């Protein structure tokens, strides 16, 4: 059973979360986690001016995802940073190229899930995931979130990302904050949860 993890990351926060999601997927017997990134749309000059060039080198080895890989997967987990309460434009452009999957119904009945990041605690994480879900619904996917059975969801002793809609991390106003142990645990839990649901959906 193949679980595809498709992400866009500018400074590495979503990449780190994607790695944790993959760990969760691999904890389920028979589940294979495959990491893929979507194509970058910003020029090298713009990335350099934003201080993202060095950060992106840490995940440059991850292959760029193709549309066909989505159709071949048993489940897909998407990761994107928040951009004004919505997904990043790079992810939007990638999804806009999946029309043929919609026509063929290649994703109908497959588990789909989303995780995200933002600079601030209330920076649009929930709206980003919920608006992303609309795309999955149009593809006929079965939406899977991060249930409250993940106990870190209810922690009150620290600032942390995470909601029933999906795992998330807070990068801070300068982007210096890295995903916390609790946020990474939520990502692992979500990966495992999606893999378990996908296994049930793919049983004959």
Swiss-Prot record:
Binding site for substrate: 102
Family: Belongs to the WrbA family.
Reactions that this protein is recorded to catalyse: a quinone + NADH + H(+) = a quinol + NAD(+); a quinone + NADPH + H(+) = a quinol + NADP(+)
This protein's UniProt keywords: Flavoprotein, FMN, NAD, NADP, Nucleotide-binding, Oxidoreductase
Organism: Syntrophobacter fumaroxidans (strain DSM 10017 / MPOB)
Protein name in the entry: NAD(P)H dehydrogenase (quinone)
Documented EC number(s): 1.6.5.2
InterPro entries per the UniProt record, alphabetical: Flavodoxin/NO_synth (IPR008254), Flavoprotein-like_sf (IPR029039), Flavoprotein_WrbA-like (IPR010089), FMN_Rdtase-like_dom (IPR005025), NQO (IPR037513)
Gene Ontology CC annotation, any one: membrane
């Amino acid at each position: 059973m193949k679980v595809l993890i498709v992400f866009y990351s500018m400074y590495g926060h979503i990449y780190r979360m994607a790695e944790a999601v993959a760990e969760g997927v691999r904890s389920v017997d028979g589940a294979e986690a495959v990491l893929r990134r979507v194509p970058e749309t910003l020029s090298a000059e713009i990335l350099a001016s934003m201080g993202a060039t060095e950060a992106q080198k840490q995940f440059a080895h991850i292959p760029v995802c193709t549309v066909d890989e989505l159709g071949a997967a048993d489940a897909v987990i998407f990761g994107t940073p928040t951009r004004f309460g919505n997904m990043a434009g790079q992810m939007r452009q990638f999804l806009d190229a999946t029309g043929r999957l919609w026509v063929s119904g290649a994703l109908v009945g497959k588990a789909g899930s989303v995780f995200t990041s933002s600079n601030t605690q209330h920076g649009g994480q929930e709206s980003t995931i919920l608006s992303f879900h609309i795309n999955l619904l149009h593809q006929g996917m079965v939406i899977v979130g991060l249930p409250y059975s993940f106990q870190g969801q209810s922690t009150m002793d620290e600032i942390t990302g995470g909601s029933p809609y999906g795992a998330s991390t807070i990068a801070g106003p300068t982007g210096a904050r890295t995903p916390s142990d609790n946020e990474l645990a939520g990502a692992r839990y979500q990966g495992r949860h999606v893999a378990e649901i996908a296994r049930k959906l793919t049983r004959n």
